[in-house]
A protein has these predicted regions:
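Positively charged, structured surface patches that bind polyanionic biopolymers
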Residues: 1-89
Length: 89
């Protein structure tokens, strides 16, 4: 029995890691971890047109994002605050 899979694509600019916001983020304590978390958020949001949703009408919480990204809730909360401040999400 074959399974049907949906594939999504995300384009990053060639200069993504040279963007001033990403460079600032990278220099922070836990910065590289936050960059990976940001990319995970971008990928999680692909099926929902850029929204962080668990399903059609159910938004993610800090707890659910922590589970699906395999990070601690506190790390997710701190990262989201930084991403909002930088305008990354």
């Amino acid at each position: 029995m074959s399974e049907n899979h949906k594939y999504y694509y995300m384009k990053l600019k060639e200069t993504f890691f040279n963007d001033s916001k990403i460079l600032l983020l990278e220099q922070m304590q836990d910065g590289p971890l936050y960059i990976l978390l940001l990319l995970k958020f971008y990928l999680i949001s692909l099926p929902y047109n850029g929204l962080l949703l668990v399903s059609e009408n159910m938004p993610h919480t800090f707890q659910t994002l922590a589970i699906v990204t395999r990070y601690q809730v506190g790390t997710v909360e701190r990262a989201i605050k930084i991403f909002l401040k930088f305008g990354l999400i």
